[in-house]
């Protein structure tokens, strides 16, 4: 999109949104863009869509993935690949699955490049992963989300204790 269209309008999912969020929700998408006719049809994302980082300066980061967990309209940019559901899956579980060491290894080998590494839809479509039944996906996703929430709480407590310690020392 033209640079003048940025800063207002429809939320625009960039690579930074994929990398810097546990999950992508409408309210944590940083950028906005004025959309043209047909942009929503072509680049729109729906709840549960998987978004991949198309290119990276390091092979280890190519194909990093996240999921959109909102129903509000948003679009994705050119350095992002959108994956649509071919079947039934739990988006929460899938986010964790795609970040697992096994999935990362299988995605990384599909990347190509010398100084800048890329992966395309064709490469991603050839990645094979073992996926449990929907009931198990739901349980695993919820458990991992609970663990992440607990880790975040503990990290906040640690930060607060560090601040308290500094205040006492000063």
Q: Can you say where each PLM-predicted feature lies in the sequence?
A:
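Sequence-specific dsDNA recognition surfaces
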Residues: 1-2, 16-50
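A short glycine-rich beta-alpha junction/loop motif
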Residues: 7, 73-79, 89, 101, ...
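Cleft-lining beta-strand/loop regions that shape enzyme active-site pockets
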Residues: 13
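Short, ligand-facing micro-motifs at secondary-structure edges
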Residues: 19-31, 50-76, 92-96, 105-109
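Amphipathic alpha-helical segments
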Residues: 94, 128-167
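A cross-family detector of function-defining hotspots
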Residues: 170
